């Protein structure tokens, strides 16, 4: 980690859920996020880990269901908005860790949610993932492709978790006729 930047304004994260049960979110100030990302890239960042304050709603039914293995992550949609916005704008890998108040201990906690109960953010997980993130290639700029690079034309199929079919990479694969296995 070579540079830490704070946004010049609160992002104003809002969480929502669609009728299908998928989570999504919006930002009041995406411009503040993009300016902070630009400062990091100018300082030499090759990947960005974002920690943003998220709304706390410890009494929500969605949170209780998720903690007990019966629901979707209500934060994931807004996290994706943050990460995808920066990746699309800066063309470098980015991942997000929400900052939340600690939740009270739950003896019925589902093991799949246990890792998310260990701290106020999930930054350690994000940093491990980003340390293994691939470089993004802009083929329209005429960059050279190494024999170890993976590009869309080389994909025979894409395997994704059931219910995770709305992401940009999956939709782009479908547009190219690449089979998607869920």
For the regions a language model picked out, list residue spans one by one.
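Anaerobic metallocofactor- and corrinoid-dependent redox/one-carbon enzyme cores
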Residues: 1-182
